[in-house]
C-alpha cells in the first residue's frame, strides 16, 4: 500500500484521473505513461538512514521497498533503478518504463558505476555491498527498459516519493 497525499502529488492541478484516462488509478498528468514504475529514495541526513521504493503507476501498488540502511539519497536512487530493472528482467516485463527524478542516478546507471563519495565504514558496509551488486548486475545484463526523467517542477513529486520534504526541490 502506498500513501499518497496532497504534498506527494501536485493536487492543486489534478484531483482524480480524467474520465478519459482508464489506464491508471493515480492522478497522473496526461503526458506521463501509466504503463510504468516510479522509483524514489528517501534519506534523513547525508549520510543517514536511507530507503528506497518502487510504485506501479497503473495500480498505485508498491512493487518493492528496501531499507532503511545507512547511505545517501543518491545511492538509494541508483539502487532503486537497478532493483527495478532486475525485477523487470526476473519477471519478464519488457513493456514498461521506469521514472526516476534523479539525474545522478540515471547517469550512474548509464555509466554502470555509482560515483558515490560515501565513506566506507562498518555502518555503510551494507550500502556499499548493494552498490557493488548493482554495478555487477549492470555489467552482466543488458536491458532495453527506458529510464525516463520525472519532471518534478511540472508534475509534482514522483508517486514513489516518501513525502518527507519540506518545500525542497530535487
Regions found by a protein language model. Give the residues of each.
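RNase H-like nuclease fold core
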Residues: 12-75, 87
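Acidic, His- and aromatic-enriched active-site or binding-groove loops in soluble protein domains
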Residues: 168-170
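RNase H catalytic domain
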Residues: 43-46, 86-163
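An active-site-proximal "capping" alpha-helix that borders the catalytic cofactor pocket
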Residues: 76-84
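Glycine-rich loops and low-complexity Gly/Arg-rich segments
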Residues: 61-65, 78-79, 90, 121-125
